[in-house]
Regions:
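Intrinsically disordered, charged and Pro/Gly-enriched terminal/linker segments
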Residues: 1-6, 28-30, 34-36, 45, ...
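Extreme N-terminal starter segment of soluble prokaryotic enzymes
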Residues: 11-12
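A structural micro-motif at secondary-structure boundaries
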Residues: 15-37
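Conserved RecA-like P-loop NTPase ATPase core
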Residues: 21, 40, 55, 78, ...
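Short capping segments at the starts of secondary-structure elements
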Residues: 42-55
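Short amphipathic alpha-helical interaction segments
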Residues: 66-77
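C-terminal flanking helix
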Residues: 75-86, 219
């Protein structure tokens, strides 16, 4: 006896980083093929029916008039995956001969929407926004139509990461500040505020050579990429960091001298 398709109570969709779709009961729905994954991603981000021609042109502009071929294949793969999961296709897809879209009730949660809502909400902590960002949008799909949205979301993430690095530093969490700043620099070496945080961290916990190396890295990348010098506030942080390391070195030397003097007195 053929199983009856289940009504959809909402899909949980992850598009940031690894592509994942889960049913309301937590089961992962596997969609095979990058074209099918790209189609679902575009439909989830659009949230309204669009003409099939417009969808095909967005996803496969290089195919010109033949783009409906890849669309038919991707739609077939998508329908097959949803049906294999036992879902009622009519409750997920809104489709006719001209248009295609996801029904609004088909999505219970979308990580992109949660992340954007958090970055828009002044009461949502930047730490929460950073935690919700699982990776760049549509990683590995390679479709140019996602490039603009991917960059926009990445900018929001990097802005939140910069705030997190600064907040951790100000709260005394030097290690957490270092990790956040290094992650930001790994994504964008031109983020001067992240370099400044690392300079400050090295000033508080590191050595003079670490402070100097970090400052020189910043100077080099700014000169090479922008033909600019560090901002005055970064220079001020650099001077403070140098002074902190020098003070610690002198304190250690003084302790060593006192210890040596005490030992000599005991021997004498």
């Amino acid at each position: 006896m053929t199983a009856r398709p289940r009504a959809v109570s909402g899909l949980d969709v992850t598009l940031l980083g690894r592509f994942v779709i889960r049913s309301a009961d937590g089961r992962e729905i596997r969609i095979v093929g990058r074209h099918a994954q790209a189609l679902f991603t575009l439909l989830a981000l659009t949230c309204r029916p669009r003409t099939r021609e417009a969808i095909a042109t967005d996803l496969w502009p290089e195919s010109l008039g033949a783009a409906t071929g890849p669309l038919r294949q991707a739609l077939y793969q998508l329908r097959t995956a949803l049906a294999a999961a036992g879902l009622d296709l009519d409750m997920v897809l809104e489709a006719d001969s001209e248009t295609l879209g996801l029904r609004p009730e088909a999505l219970r949660s979308l990580d992109v929407a949660r992340f954007e809502a958090c970055t828009d909400d002044p009461f949502c902590a930047p730490e929460a926004a950073v935690a919700q960002y699982g990776g760049d949008l549509a990683e590995g799909l390679g479709h140019d139509c996602f490039a603009g949205e991917r960059e926009r979301l990445a900018d929001r993430y990097e802005d939140a990461l910069a705030v997190v690095a600064r907040q951790r530093l100000e709260s005394g969490d030097e290690e957490g500040a270092r990790l956040a700043a290094e992650r930001l620099i790994g994504r964008d070496p031109l983020r001067e505020e992240a370099h400044e945080v690392l300079i400050a961290v090295h000033g508080q916990t590191g050595t003079r050579s670490q402070v100097v190396r970090q400052y020189r890295r910043l100077c080099d990348v700014l000169a090479r990429e922008l033909a600019e010098a560090p901002l005055p506030e970064t220079d001020a942080t650099y001077r403070v960091a140098l002074a902190q390391t020098i003070a610690r070195s002198r304190e250690r030397a003084a302790r060593l001298e006192r210890s040596t003097g005490t030992n000599l007195a005991v021997v004498g």
